[in-house]
Amino acid sequence: MSVLEQEKKSGKVYIETYGCQMNEYDSGIVSSLMRDAEYSTSSDPENSDIIFLNTCAIRENAHAKIYNRLQSLGYLKKRNPNLVIGVLGCMAQNLGDDLFHQELPLDLVVGPDNYRSLPELIQRIRKGENSISLTRLSKIETYDEIEPRVVNGIQAFVTIMRGCNNFCTFCVVPYTRGRERSRDPKSIVREVQDLVQKGIRQITLLGQNVNSYKEQDTDFAGLIQMLLDETSIERIRFTSPHPKDFPTHLLQLMSENPRFCPNIHLPLQAGNTRVLEEMKRSYSKEEFLDVVKEIRNIVPDVGITTDIIVGFPNETEEEFEDTLAVVREVQFDMAFMFKYSEREGTMAQRKLPDNVPEEVKSARLTKLVDLQTSISHEQNRARIGRVYSILIENISRKSEKQLCGRTPCGRMTVFPLPQETNVSGMIGSTVSVQIESATSATLKGRILA
């Protein structure tokens, strides 16, 4: 490569990530691709030649956040007209060229399946093109060989599949991420082996429907077994699954292997069968409760968390009460709870009226949050006196004299740093912690000698 070509390609890339862990992982993929193309990464947008916003499209406020952020970057574009600004991810895929009609300082719009093209697209911008959009969905792209290096201390995310085939009526993911395709299991094993060599002790496997993983003759349970057999990773977690894909042999594997953490995120979305049918969730209230019963029969000390939407189109007060009844019956450890908001391009937006008044949605959400907070507190209080094996993940955000980590069943736990102990030497170690008190969000305890 000539000096001139090197100068044209060189530059500092800043990536700002919004949304889920999958986006965090994808930002790692983009960083790796840009490094391979001889760009360097930057932690400062003010001192960068390229700014990427890796975006989310799941919630209504996600779009507003990005519009506001792009407007706030306008002064950098005025100061440096050669600055390249791109929107990546689900919002890019969802809105495409429409983003260029908003009078925003924007050069590139690139969907999740097109990140390999970023270096070439930047060169086209630098040669004078503008407003380039690339949002093709792929049936095969999994970025198998890319090393994203998405590491947080002693834990890391590993994407094992991309896309979704379920087409829930409220969800934009199948339209922004494409159809399901799974990575080669051998490439996943290699990635985890590499992470272990780098000091990673815990991984979280990612996918839009992570337990729908299927590649060659390997299903999700088979992949877990490979990771248990062929790597020394200490703890394996996963998110987000679908309730329809919990075969008995997967649960038995969890019950028999302490390295496969008994921590399941099981999205309910609604507790009324008619509403679930409108959502196209492919299970009834009774079928969901049967899945919960089987999980708890096979994995007694499991932690179960969930997602719930209130105010879905045509949801009546009685149907909302059904959701509250399911929450009381299941006793979730924790829940992510949201008011329904229309997402452009979804079946619900096209076919169903957003006809539950905003004040009713807000009242229902408040009622649900109050109920779940009370349940979470009781669930955590029931753990007082118990002893858990906890992998120390970090220093507590509230005090440098406190350490934190999660129980195998997923509850965040904080406990004092032992006197005359080096903090850095503790992070990544596994200790026995006795629980002494609890809030709705956190367990508090002490390390046993």
Curated annotation (Swiss-Prot):
Its EC number is 2.8.4.3. It catalyses: N(6)-dimethylallyladenosine(37) in tRNA + (sulfur carrier)-SH + AH2 + 2 S-adenosyl-L-methionine = 2-methylsulfanyl-N(6)-dimethylallyladenosine(37) in tRNA + (sulfur carrier)-H + 5'-deoxyadenosine + L-methionine + A + S-adenosyl-L-homocysteine + 2 H(+). The keyword Transport does not apply. InterPro entries: Elp3/MiaA/NifB-like_rSAM, Methylthiotransferase, Methylthiotransferase_CS, Methylthiotransferase_N, Methylthiotransferase_N_sf, MiaB_methiolase, rSAM, rSAM_horseshoe. It is an enzyme of class 2 (transferase). Residues 11-127 form the MTTase N-terminal domain. [4Fe-4S] cluster 1 binds at C20, C56, C90. It comes from the Bacteria. Binds 2 [4Fe-4S] clusters. One cluster is coordinated with 3 cysteines and an exchangeable S-adenosyl-L-methionine. GO terms for cellular component: cytosol. GO terms for biological process: tRNA methylthiolation. Keywords: 4Fe-4S, Cytoplasm, Iron, Iron-sulfur, Metal-binding, S-adenosyl-L-methionine, Transferase, tRNA processing. GO terms for molecular function: 4 iron, 4 sulfur cluster binding; metal ion binding; N6-isopentenyladenosine methylthiotransferase activity. Residues 150-378 form the Radical SAM core domain. It is found in: Cytoplasm. [4Fe-4S] cluster 2 binds at C164, C168, C171. Belongs to the methylthiotransferase family. MiaB subfamily. Monomer. This is tRNA-2-methylthio-N(6)-dimethylallyladenosine synthase.
